[in-house]
């Protein structure tokens, strides 16, 4: 699976759930934790999500907490 495909899946899951867990993403996409970690880092750099321990949350959800 290409990284852009994984990004799309991650962002779709974040639209449905405020938080996604790394373990669940690994199972969903059949990839390693390291691959998911790199994907989450790339999406965070683009401002599309906020990484948290064990997963990620919507970027806008983290802004409204402050």
Regions found by a protein language model. Name each.
Residues 2-23, 27-28, 34, 40-66:
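HTH-adjacent hinge/linker in prokaryotic transcriptional regulators
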């Amino acid at each position: 699976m290409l990284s852009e495909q994984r990004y799309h899946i991650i962002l779709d899951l974040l639209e449905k759930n405020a938080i996604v867990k790394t373990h669940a993403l690994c199972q969903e996409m059949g990839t390693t934790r390291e691959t998911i970690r790199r994907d989450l880092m790339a999406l965070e750099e683009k401002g599309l999500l906020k990484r948290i321990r064990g997963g990620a949350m919507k970027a806008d959800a983290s802004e409204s907490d402050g």
